[in-house]
């Protein structure tokens, strides 16, 4: 039996007496059998690929970085979500800013962000990265990394748990699913 015949057998209607289930298998031939390929919107395909292979770059500045390392350890296993930490901004599409951002580090954060290829996303992890946190009134602290780079997801906590970071990453995946990449 050839490949097309096997696919045809799988694509035929499983409901008896010739009834057609319009939701699962619409009436008529499938595009795969007619033309040999399946069509989908390019946005859906790109977003599926992007959510399945997010490569974050760690920008650990303080104690939140320890929880970020904990999220990448064996207990939570970010690899099952297709998330692999990358050492270089040119290889990553997500930046996780974890910890207190001081004024001297702000230009370096922006420089690293600018080196990332498009499309790029930022997760702000912890109270200090979100809004200055405990050091909010210090003269040397940036009151939120969103003043330097655009932030897509905020993960609250001091420090946030590794589970909270995983939840934030899953929220970013949902946000990526909803984006429209190609102007239409």
UniProtKB/Swiss-Prot annotation:
It comes from the Bacteria. The keyword Nucleotide-binding does not apply. Gene3D superfamilies: 3.40.50.12280. It is a peripheral membrane protein. GO terms for molecular function: 4 iron, 4 sulfur cluster binding; iron ion binding; NADH dehydrogenase (ubiquinone) activity; NADH:ubiquinone reductase (non-electrogenic) activity; quinone binding. It is found in: Cell inner membrane. It is an enzyme of class 7 (translocase). It catalyses: a quinone + NADH + 5 H(+)(in) = a quinol + NAD(+) + 4 H(+)(out). InterPro entries: NADH_UbQ_OxRdtase-like_20kDa, NADH_UQ_OxRdtase_20Kd_su. Keywords: 4Fe-4S, Cell inner membrane, Cell membrane, Iron, Iron-sulfur, Membrane, Metal-binding, NAD, Quinone, Translocase, Transport, Ubiquinone. GO terms for cellular component: plasma membrane; respiratory chain complex I. Its main location: membrane. NDH-1 is composed of 14 different subunits. Subunits NuoB, C, D, E, F, and G constitute the peripheral sector of the complex. This is NADH-quinone oxidoreductase subunit B. It comes from Xylella fastidiosa (strain M12). The gene is nuoB.
């Amino acid at each position: 039996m050839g490949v097309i015949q096997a696919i045809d057998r799988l694509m035929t209607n499983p409901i008896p007496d010739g009834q057609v289930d319009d939701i699962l298998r619409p009436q008529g031939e499938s595009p795969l059998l007619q033309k040999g390929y399946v069509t989908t919107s390019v946005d859906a395909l790109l977003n599926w690929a992007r959510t399945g292979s997010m490569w974050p770059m760690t920008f650990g500045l303080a104690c939140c970085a320890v929880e970020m390392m904990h999220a990448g350890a064996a207990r939570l296993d970010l690899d099952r979500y297709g998330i692999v930490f990358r050492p270089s901004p040119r290889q990553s599409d997500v930046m996780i800013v974890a910890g207190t951002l001081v004024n001297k580090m702000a230009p370096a954060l922006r420089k690293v962000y600018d080196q990332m290829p498009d499309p790029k996303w930022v997760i702000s992890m912890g109270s200090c990265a979100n809004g200055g946190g405990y050091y909010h009134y210090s003269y040397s602290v940036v009151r939120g990394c969103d003043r330097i780079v655009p932030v897509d997801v905020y993960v609250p906590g001091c420090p946030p748990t590794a589970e909270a970071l995983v939840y934030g990453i899953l929220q970013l995946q949902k946000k990526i699913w909803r984006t429209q990449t190609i102007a239409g």
